[in-house]
């Protein structure tokens, strides 16, 4: 039951952005997630302090350096892995 509540909470906080070019609201950061097809997500900036999110950022740095192909922060992991990690950060 806790897992279901965790997923529902993640859906509220971790939202998929519909406008790929739109600016992120104050307090949020747009990231592109996926291996072949990238999807844009908005995540709270507070995630930047979390070790598990920092691990995703390190993976991104190793693969892309500071040259991100989408023009924004790209996290090269499967979408379900990203959702799993971020759902634990609430």
Swiss-Prot record:
Note the coiled coil stretches, chain numbering.
none
Where in or outside the cell it occurs: the entry states: Cell membrane
Which keywords has UniProt assigned to this entry? Auxin signaling pathway, Cell membrane, Developmental protein, Growth regulation, Membrane
Q: One GO cellular component term, please give it.
A: plasma membrane
UniProt membrane topology term: Peripheral membrane protein
- What turns on expression? By auxin.
Cross-referenced InterPro entries:
SAUR_fam
Q: Does the keyword Zinc-finger apply?
A: no
GO biological process terms, semicolon-separated: auxin-activated signaling pathway
Pfam families, per database record: Auxin_inducible
Report whether Membrane shows up as a keyword of the record: yes
Lineage: superkingdom: Eukaryota
Entry's family note: Belongs to the ARG7 family.
Q: What does this protein do?
A: Functions as a positive effector of cell expansion through modulation of auxin transport.
Query: What is the designated name of this protein?
Result: Auxin-responsive protein SAUR24
């Amino acid at each position: 039951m806790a897992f279901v509540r965790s997923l529902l909470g993640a859906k509220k906080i971790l939202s998929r952005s519909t406008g790929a070019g739109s600016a992120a609201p104050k307090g949020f950061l747009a990231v592109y997630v996926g291996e072949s097809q990238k999807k844009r997500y908005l995540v709270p900036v507070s995630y930047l302090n979390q070790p598990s999110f920092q691990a995703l950022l390190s993976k991104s740095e190793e693969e892309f350096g500071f040259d991100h192909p989408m023009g924004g922060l790209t996290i090269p992991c499967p979408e379900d892995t990203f959702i799993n990690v971020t759902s634990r950060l609430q």
